[in-house]
Every structure is written in C-alpha cells, then in structure tokens.
Amino acid sequence: MAEERNFRKVRRGYVVSDKMDKTISVELEQRSTHPLYGKVVRSTRTVKVHDEHNEAHIGDLVSIMETRPLSKTKRWRLDSIIERAK
C-alpha cells in the first residue's frame, strides 16, 4: 500500500510576485550553451507556485517541487525558503 512516489522535479528560483493568496510567482532561469557559437544563453520562465502559509516574499530564493495540478496554471508547490531577501 505505501508505495514510493515517483521522482519529482525540484527547481530553485527567485520570487517575483507574492500578491496572490496562497500563490507566488517564481522565475526559473535556464542556462544552455549555443550549439554553434558556444555562448552561454540565459532563458527565463515564470511559474505559479502554491504557498500554503504565505511564507515567501518578493526577492526570496526558494526551492519548489512539482506536484499534481492544483488549478488551471499551478503545478508546483513551495518546498523550502533557501535565502530571505535582504
């Protein structure tokens, strides 16, 4: 009955918005090398994250974990706050 859960993605990013109730927006950065020119290309995307106790604030570095769909756009939940904004 108590089976092990499948591997869940864990990402780190910065909180860019905390104006919603129990939801934060986190900006995730992905760096990759251009296949021809070798330059490091930086691309970002913003995801909505479930924050049950409204703990995170703008500028915090957070760890988020993939979860089941919680709403139309929320598929991530707050795992931990790594570093508070100064």
UniProtKB/Swiss-Prot annotation:
GO cellular component terms attached to this protein's record: cytosolic small ribosomal subunit
Keyword field contains RNA-binding: yes
SUPFAM superfamilies, alphabetized: Nucleic acid-binding proteins
A GO MF term: rRNA binding
Domain of life per record: Bacteria
A family per Pfam: Ribosomal_S17
Keyword annotations of the record: Ribonucleoprotein, Ribosomal protein, RNA-binding, rRNA-binding
Record InterPro entries: NA-bd_OB-fold, Ribosomal_uS17, Ribosomal_uS17_bact/chlr, Ribosomal_uS17_CS
Single Gene Ontology BP annotation: translation
Family as reported in the entry's similarity comment: Belongs to the universal ribosomal protein uS17 family.
Quaternary structure and partners: Part of the 30S ribosomal subunit.
Reported function: One of the primary rRNA binding proteins, it binds specifically to the 5'-end of 16S ribosomal RNA.
The protein's name in its UniProt record: Small ribosomal subunit protein uS17
Organism of this sequence: Bifidobacterium adolescentis (strain ATCC 15703 / DSM 20083 / NCTC 11814 / E194a)
